[in-house]
Amino acid sequence: MLTRTFLGMAISAFLASTGVQAAWSSHGPNVMYYWGQNSAGGSNTQASLGTYCESGQVDAVLLSFLHVFNVGGIPEINLSSACAGTYFPNTQLLSCPAVGADIKKCQDKGVKVILSLGGAAGVYGFTSDAQGQQFAQTIWNLFGGGNSDTRPFGDAVIDGVDLDIEGGSSTGYVAFVNALRQKFSSNFLIGAAPQCPFPDAILGSVLNSASFDYVNVQFYNNYCSATGSSFNFDTWDNWAKTTSPNKNVKIMFTVPGSSTAAGSGYVPMSTLQTIVPSLASKYSSYGGVSVWDASQAWNNGGFNSQLYSLVHSGGSTPPPPSSSSATKTTTKTTATSTKTTTTTAPTATSTPGSCPVANQPCSTQNQYACTADGKYAVCDHGKWVASSCPSNTVCIPTTDGASIYCGYATGSGSTCPSVSALEITAASLGSKNGPVPRPYKASKVAAQLAVTSTDKNSFEAVINARRTTLTPFEKSVTIEFTTPSNIKFTESDMGPVRQVGNKVRIQAKNDYNESMTLVVKVKGSINSGVFVAPSTSAWNFK
């Protein structure tokens, strides 16, 4: 593992040889990184803020996070090991002078430094517009041009605010944004980080009513990830041009920095090299790429240097990183691991634009695909055999683009063809419309089930649950739902799973004492037929 000092030296050497100089452009494209949480988890996997800004591979950094606000007293920040243990007297607000010094270094190099509010962990939100307006004054005093005895970054002044509001309610955020606009200069950046299902469960109405400079749409941990047939950048582009108060708002393609950075939705560089130029050429609202997070990307075999070259070269394929810029890839042990199996996966049809037709020839035994009328078809001894999904469900491709399942959906049309990851991207960028997975609703919770992969005997999926009130999830969360009779849930990465009949209970151990969202990986078996998603009703989170 590279030390922070050596990492910085390696980056500097690489930049000296290439002449790359990062700087924010109001017209884009830009590369943005979330920094502060060290989600890679190693003692040396997160370098200092200044190191990333000096790399020449970052146009903006999002300080992550100001995670507690408007719950009484002054707010709190959490930057993992980058700032720990030194609090202002009689508060839980950290004093981070080293980060303040690095903010100035970044700004001297043209890199924007944006404070991200919210995140998965923490407690936050407003109950009125007046609270939102008052909090704008707090941000001005603590991080802007105002005065306070408790300024975490000293006299450094941030360049913007990012609303990464994962849970709670929409109340007060429009008033907050409008008040920020009145206090800060016209070049102060205000962004948001909605999840890709449209409209966002929390920020949907806020995005329609307040003026944002960019939105970091999270294309991961959901059905609308970039490698699935429901990739919906076109939906967000349409919102930018028709609904957003700021018709020049930029849509950032936000992705995980490595396979361990998210529950699902990681896009390898080989696929990004197809997606990014397609987005850049097709959508005028495209603003570049945002990444969760710096610690993951910089420990992913040159991902960071290749991405920056890709985005700023107009999408042409960058050369492989030189040895001086390469960083050692680290691995992270997770609660669940992928088993190696000899089972033939129900791979999707390989002919772009074609749909299987019952009794017509096919070439790959046990190949699965969606038909034009919402059924699913299996290649059986050289012919397609079509079957109907259970009542009220339709055939939907999995998020990895390699298989299918039957699920509850909204919208109409066809999900056919289900094709490979690169072919899916081409189809999706063509503004393909069709049914998408229906949200799961429970008391005080909005959730999505993203089915990441299936084969003949097993499945993997991600439950993405978000609080819709100001009350967070606690350390222990019980998740209950009903599953079809042919499906057995057996594992989760957050705690034990028990299934009696078709009743499933997951005893999830939250990574945080309090959080506004839960992302739970689950696995299980398929006794017969194909994977059928659980009913969207009768879900409980307690």
Swiss-Prot record:
Region entry Disordered, spans: 312-356
Subunit structure: Monomer.
Primary role: Probably involved in the apical growth and branching of fungal hyphae.
Biased composition (Low complexity): 323-354
Annotated ranges, domain GH18: 29-314
Protein name per its UniProtKB record: Chitinase 2
Species, as recorded: Rhizopus oligosporus
Gene3D superfamilies, per the entry: Glycosidases (3.20.20.80)
